[in-house]
Amino acid sequence: HGYDVVIHVAAIVHRKSITNDEIYTKVNALLPVAVAEKAKKSGVKHFVFLSTMAVYGQGKKLSGNVIDINSKPFPLSPYGKSKYAAEQKLSILSTDHFIVSIIRAPNVYGKGCKGGYITGYANIVKKMPVIPSVYEDIKQSVLYVDNLAELCRLIILNQDGGIFLPQDDKTVSAVELMNAISKNLGMNKSKSRLLGWLIKLLSFTSYVNKGYGGISYSMEASRYVHGNYVVVEFDKAIEETLR
C-alpha cells in the first residue's frame, strides 16, 4: 500500500561485451516478472513495462520497413527475445485488478540519454563537409524522452492496459535528422547529391544500412486514444537534446 504504479525501465540493451544470453534473460525477462509479481502481491494496481521495437525482429532496411498494428513479434536478438519473453509472462499476470501496460519504444533520445543514437549522427555531421543526400524517403521512428514520459503519465492517469507503439510527431530520414543536427550545432551544412550517390554505391555495406536504413511504426499504430503524448515536436526535441 502506498504505491499506485510501478514503472519498470531497468534492462540490458545491446552490449558486445556480453556474450552470455543468460544475462539478458535474467535482467530483461526474469527480473521484470519478479518485480511485477511482488507489486501485484503487495496490492499495487498498475505495472508499466518499457519494452522495445526489437521484439518484432525487424531491422533497418534501405527499402524501408514499416511496422503496423497487424505486425507480429518475432524477436531475433537476445535483447528482443528477452524483452518479448517478459511481455508474454507479464500479460498472464494482467487482471481486472492488476493493469499491465507494455510500451514498445523505438530509439529513445534526449539530453543525457544513454545509447548515443543522436550522438552518432552528430559525430557524422561534424566530420563531413556536407550532408550526403540519399534515401530521403526512407524513414525511421524515434521517441523523445519527454514524450515517452508524457505517454507514461497518460497511461497511468487513464489506467490503460495493453501494448503501445509510441513515436514522435513524425518519422524522419537520416538526412532530415542530420539536417536538424547541423542546424542546431550552428553549422547549417548543405546537402550533396554527389556524395549521396557515392554512399549509394556502398549500399551493400552494413554501415550504410545502419546509417540510412529505415524502420518505423505507422502513424496509425502510434496513436493514443486518450490524449496527445507528443508534448515536444521533433525539431524542438533535437534542439533541446543538443543544447
Could you tell me what each predicted segment is?
Residues 1-30, 34, 38, 56-58:
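NAD(P)H-binding glycine-rich loop region in Rossmannoid oxidoreductase-like domains
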Residues 33-78:
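Conserved Rossmann-fold NAD(P)-dependent oxidoreductase catalytic core, especially the SDR/UDP-sugar
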Residues 25-32, 48, 82-83, 141:
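Short alpha-helix in the Rossmann-fold core of NAD(P)-dependent oxidoreductases
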Residues 110, 132-139, 164-172, 182-185, ...:
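Glycine-rich Rossmann NAD(P)(H)-binding loop
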Residues 26, 61-109, 113:
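Catalytic helix-loop patch of NAD(P)-dependent Rossmann-fold dehydrogenases
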Residues 93-102, 106-141, 145-147:
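NAD(P)-dependent short-chain dehydrogenase/reductase
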Residues 151-208, 234-243:
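Mid/C-terminal beta-alpha module of Rossmann-like enzyme folds, strongest
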